[in-house]
Amino acid sequence: MMDGYAQEWPRLTHTDNGLAMDQLGGDLPLDVGFEPQTRARSNTWPCPRPENFVEPTDELDSTKASNQQLAPGDSQQAIQNANAAKKNSSRRNAWGNLSYADLITHAIGSATDKRLTLSQIYEWMVQNVPYFKDKGDSNSSAGWKNSIRHNLSLHNRFMRVQNEGTGKSSWWMLNPEAKPGKSVRRRAASMETSRYEKRRGRAKKRVEALRQAGVVGLNDATPSPSSSVSEGLDHFPESPLHSGGGFQLSPDFRQRASSNASSCGRLSPIRAQDLEPDWGFPVDYQNTTMTQAHAQALEELTGTMADELTLCNQQQQGFSAASGLPSQPPPPPYQPPQHQQAQQQQQQQSPYALNGPASGYNTLQPQSQCLLHRSLNCSCMHNARDGLSPNSVTTTMSPAYPNSEPSSDSLNTYSNVVLDGPADTAALMVQQQQQQQQQQQLSASLEGQCLEVLNNEAQPIDEFNLENFPVGNLECNVEELLQQEMSYGGLLDINIPLATVNTNLVNSSSGPLSISNISNLSNISSNSGSSLSLNQLQAQLQQQQQQQQAQQQQQAQQQQQQHQQHQQQLLLNNNNNSSSSLELATQTATTNLNARVQYSQPSVVTSPPSWVH
């Protein structure tokens, strides 16, 4: 028995698929395709395949029969043809190269009526696409069914038709008017892309036409393609600086079109090299030329503007001093910055260092300027330039104080640093003192005039006398005066006594004239035909005022008398009430006393009658 177990167990020589197991144990040639392929981390599933890769033809084989509206053979052939056409496409899905929209298109096209409901599209997917065969249940089909609904409502190639029957889902059909090729998303169709493209095309055509016509910017600058037409036309025909071509720019200034920071074709104030801080003196450009006519025109223009602004500023200062308004506190003392102090020290050490040859109007610009100098090209030092030699250089320092606006003329001393001989310095000092004296005299005269005007305005109106006023033959028409007063409104009370108008109507016109008697007054004045002079009118007004005062006094006296009478009556009433109360009290007391006396008397015993026994 045991010997039988010592024998070797029988081995199977074939497997289920017909291959011998001995063959599997031999040396098999390893396929190179099974080795791990290296790829970048940016590549996601599925891995890109080579271009000459051919997929098997039996990828989509239909094993189940469709319903009566589906044709399995036609749909399978159409899907295979579509897959063969898209073998080298970059789009890779788990079921192949076809997208959801392509699958829905094949499903609807395979139906006999060329229309399917949503449930029939789901059924076609499960029956004809191997990837969805095991995903037909409700748990695993939620994702791809949602994608199908999304694609149906998104693409224009699908159209929804209402079903005739009640309670049935709608039909989905292919839109015959849809454009072939890649479908356009509906969200993009709402944008006005056509109009936008037309406008861009017109702008490009204009730019090209202007370039071909030879329109270039300043210094032969070509505008960039992204710049608009207006940016390439930086010409100033109205400006006197650019007309005639006499004004040339410095080569140190470059255009923004040649820089990396901007694509504009305008000039940039940034110098190309040797950048200096703002407080440094700018370089004297020798090639900056200007014609003599332009220079004279600029001098006249800036001179007249400076004179007008100076006069306005002086008038404002005079009025503020005359009106007695609180003036602003004086500005703090000027303290030059550190770099300015260093420059002044260098200038003091070498005062003649900048005495080089200068041409034209080459002067150093002010370091800190007022608001007028910043906004306008003001020539405040033109008068000083006329008295200077060509080699002299003048610098004006006007510090900017906080919380205060510096005036255009500054009305105070200029600190002139003259880097020339002592003779020019003395001449400038004398001229400066003369200007200060003239300004002080002008401001004093303006201040006196303003004070005089304010004093005249402060006088009361009662002191104004018409007799001292030279009126001449000035006459007043009462009718026109009344009509004018009535035109302002019917709430005016005009009091004019009629005694001076007509002596026969003294009794009827003794009282003041109210607004109801204006028509009678106009008739009387028109019938009389006499005109009142200003003196008579003044006398009438005085009489009216006196009458009004008398009436007011009478009314006040009457009110006072009535008040006194009322108080006396109240006192009398109080006295009467007190006396009546006393009488009533005494009467009640006497009656009570009599009653008590009667009750206190002893009773009298009377004898019985005679008939009583």
Curated annotation (Swiss-Prot):
Residues 39-90, 182-205, 217-269, 317-360 are annotated as: Disordered. GO terms for biological process: cellular response to amino acid starvation; cellular response to oxidative stress; cellular response to starvation; circadian rhythm; compound eye morphogenesis; dendrite morphogenesis; determination of adult lifespan; female germ-line stem cell population maintenance. Residues 81-90, 337-353 have a biased composition (Low complexity). PROSITE patterns: FORK_HEAD_2, FORK_HEAD_3. The modification Phosphoserine is found at residues 75, 190, 259, 262-263, 268. Residues 95-201 bind DNA. GO terms for molecular function: DNA-binding transcription activator activity, RNA polymerase II-specific; DNA-binding transcription factor activity; DNA-binding transcription factor activity, RNA polymerase II-specific; RNA polymerase II cis-regulatory region sequence-specific DNA binding; RNA polymerase II transcription regulatory region sequence-specific DNA binding. The keyword Phosphoprotein applies. Disruption phenotype: Mutant foxo lacking Akt1 phosphorylation sites no longer responds to insulin inhibition, remains in the nucleus, and is constitutively active, inducing cell arrest. Transcription factor involved in the regulation of the insulin signaling pathway. Consistently activates both the downstream target Thor\d4EBP and the feedback control target InR. Involved in negative regulation of the cell cycle, modulating cell growth and proliferation. In response to cellular stresses, such as nutrient deprivation or increased levels of reactive oxygen species, foxo is activated and inhibits growth through the action of target genes such as Thor. PANTHER family: FORKHEAD BOX PROTEIN O. This is Forkhead box protein O. The gene is foxo.
